[in-house]
Each structure stands twice: as C-alpha cells, then as structure tokens.
A protein has these predicted regions:
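Flexible, P/S/T/G-rich "lid" or insertion loops adjacent to the active sites of thioester-utilizing
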Residues: 1-36
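Short, structured secondary-structure boundary patches
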Residues: 4, 38-46, 59-65
Length: 183
C-alpha cells in the first residue's frame, strides 16, 4: 500500500490539471548533473514535491509509489498503430532513504535502470499476454470480466501515489509543423 495524497475534492469530482512549460535543454542539463535520465530526475522532483507537502505525521509510514508508462517501441520494433506500452512502478521509502534530493534521484535512477531492460520488459509482456490469451478469460462474459477488472483497478490504485509520464521526443511530419505550437 502506497502513500495517498490527501486534500479537498473539487466539485463534481472534477480533476485539476496544471500544465507548465520549461526549456527541456535546461532540465536535461540539471538531470545530467545528477547523472540521471530525464524521467528519473523529474520523477524525483515529483517525489520531493509530494514529500514537501506531506503532513509530518504521514512521513515514512508508507512508501511513495510512482506509476510510469513505458513506451515499448523504444525497446522492441513495432509498426503497430496501437498503443504499445507497459507499466512500471518506482518506489521511494522515506524511512529507508531519507529526504535528501540527490539520494532520491540516485534511488529512482537505479530502479529505472534495472526495470527498463528488454529482458525484464519481455517478462511483463509475457504476463499480460498469458492473461489475455488464457482460455478461461476468453470464454468469461464481458460483464463478468468488467466486474473483476473494476475490483482489480481499485486494488491497484491503493498501490500508487501518483502517475508520471514522459512521452519523450515527438516527431511530426514536416508539413504538419506549421500547425503545431507545442505539445
């Protein structure tokens, strides 16, 4: 079970999204000062901000767990237009590692390096594929699968503090660039 961010809910269960823009070169420079990838560095920034806003009585009781979608096209060739990704979790335990930012970056970078290897990702893909191609899951009616998927989704939500996604470099066809201000 992961630490949960608490606070007031918005009316009608609406989400509040904060968008920001930064010069990626400057952020990359900063991440390289820590010998970290951009994703590891920004994940550590997210974790640090969660810790900074965390009530004192909650610090160290539960780990902070970040869910990160991984673009599998970076690891395996694919011509599919469909989503080709899997999910990985990184975890930071304040009790074990403390609140030093440099330590956070190092711990997160180490976890990502070990989890983002083709062999490990293949294991995850195999697990997903085995469930999808299982005879029992194919014959169970959709309404029953939906029921159990909702339960699984709620249970997995307990294991996550936040989600962070770095979609990476997006290249569009040259003729489209004049219509795009930013991503």
């Amino acid at each position: 079970v992961a630490y949960k961010i608490v606070g007031r809910k918005y009316p009608d269960d609406k989400l509040k999204v904060i968008n920001g823009m930064v010069d990626v070169k400057k952020v990359l420079e900063e991440s390289h000062k820590y010998n970290a990838t951009l994703t590891a560095f920004l994940s550590a920034v997210l974790i640090k901000s969660i810790i900074d806003e965390m009530p004192v009585r909650s610090k160290g009781k539960k780990p902070i767990t970040i869910l990160i979608p991984v673009n599998l096209r970076n690891f395996f060739p694919s011509v599919s237009a469909r989503n080709f990704f899997c999910l990985t979790y990184i975890q930071y335990d304040i009790k074990k590692h403390g609140e030093d930012f440099e330590t956070m970056v190092d711990v997160i970078n180490t976890q990502l390096k070990s989890k983002l290897k083709a062999e490990k990702l293949l294991g995850t893909i195999d697990t997903y594929s085995a469930v999808e191609h299982n005879v029992i899951t194919r014959i169970v009616p959709l309404v029953v699968k939906d029921f159990f998927l909702r339960i699984a989704y709620r249970m997995s939500g307990r294991a996550v503090t936040a989600t962070f996604s770095n979609i990476g470099i997006v290249k569009m066809p040259e003729n489209m660039n004049k219509f795009i201000k930013c991503f």
